[in-house]
A protein has these predicted regions:
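Conserved helicase motor core of P-loop NTPases
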Residues: 50, 189-279
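Conserved lysine of the Walker
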Residues: 71
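Inter-Walker segment of RecA-like/P-loop motor cores
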Residues: 96-152
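Walker B catalytic acidic pair
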Residues: 159-160, 186
Length: 279
């Protein structure tokens, strides 16, 4: 029953944000060209450009992608474009993540992405990220909904959104004022939160955010042709035959990544003997 109430509140808040005033004052494509270069579908940063262009036109959006696809880089460039459209007064930006460790990683990633901006686009860094609980002033289910604070912000960015459960997402949506933008970052293919609900994956397919979700596809950590890249793609698509073929290839390959994958598979097979389903 508690989960049903949280789902209902999420739907209501998303509908209210969708029915709110249309987004105004987003930059022209000149800003996108300055930060991402001219449109080139083959460019490694093309999916980042598309994500940024989408996010500029949405009050609530999701940017999803695997590790190393540039989610933080994209959101830093999004903030730079929003600041340019906002004028000389600084945007009120809040950064948050579900855990303290995730918040610390977000701070480090944002600082790195800020340093990579062109000099004439570098504005002040947002305030340091904090945990969602701290930002919302939430101390568990004992915190009454009527006592929850409203956030004072123009933009709220939440990283590792796949870790957010139903109740936390409902509280977050309630706390973000309708005029403020909400940007959720994460990997919809990542393991869901420990508590109830694979919320982020469901939001990506919801009628409110289906057209406000951008997927980053190019990994800047490893290529799609690498062993890890091929395994990740096969796992995400549920291609069992491809996984088996990659395993057999890895068992005779000298590539360090392939050797590592082969050892992982051997360990998984051994673990399967104790009752865990084999890949």
């Amino acid at each position: 029953r508690r989960a049903w109430r949280a789902e209902t509140r999420i739907r209501q808040h998303l509908q209210a944000r969708q029915d709110g005033a249309p987004v105004q004052g987003y930059p022209s494509t000149n800003g996108l060209d300055a930060l991402f270069g001219p449109v080139d579908p083959q460019a490694p940063q093309h999916s980042q450009r598309l994500a940024c262009a989408m996010a500029l036109r949405q009050l609530t959006c999701i940017i999803t992608g695997g590790p190393g696809t540039g989610k933080t880089t994209t959101v830093m460039r999004l903030l730079a474009l929003l600041q340019a459209a906002h004028g000389p007064s600084p945007l009120r930006v809040l950064l948050a993540a579900p855990t303290g460790k995730a918040a610390a990683r977000l701070n480090a990633s944002m600082a790195q992405a800020h340093a990579a901006l062109p000099a004439d686009w570098q504005t002040a860094l947002p305030a340091e990220a904090q945990t969602l609980h701290k930002m919302l002033g939430w101390h568990g289910l004992a915190t009454p909904l009527t006592g929850q604070r409203q956030l004072y912000a123009d933009v709220v960015v939440v990283d590792e959104a796949s870790m957010i459960d139903l109740e936390m997402m409902a509280r977050l949506l309630q706390a973000v004022p309708t005029p403020a933008r909400l940007v959720l970052l994460g990997d919809k293919d990542q393991l869901a939160s420990v508590e109830a609900g694979a919320v982020m994956a469901q939001l990506c397919e919801s009628p409110w955010l289906r057209n406000a979700t951008a997927t980053l596809t190019h990994s800047h950590r490893f290529g799609h042709d690498s062993a890890i890249g091929q395994w990740a793609q096969a796992v995400n698509t549920g291609d069992r035959a491809r996984l088996q073929a990659l395993w057999h290839q890895a068992s005779t390959d000298s590539d360090p990544q392939a050797v590592g994958v082969s050892r992982w598979q051997a360990g998984a097979n051994q673990h399967a003997m104790w009752g865990t389903a084999q890949v």
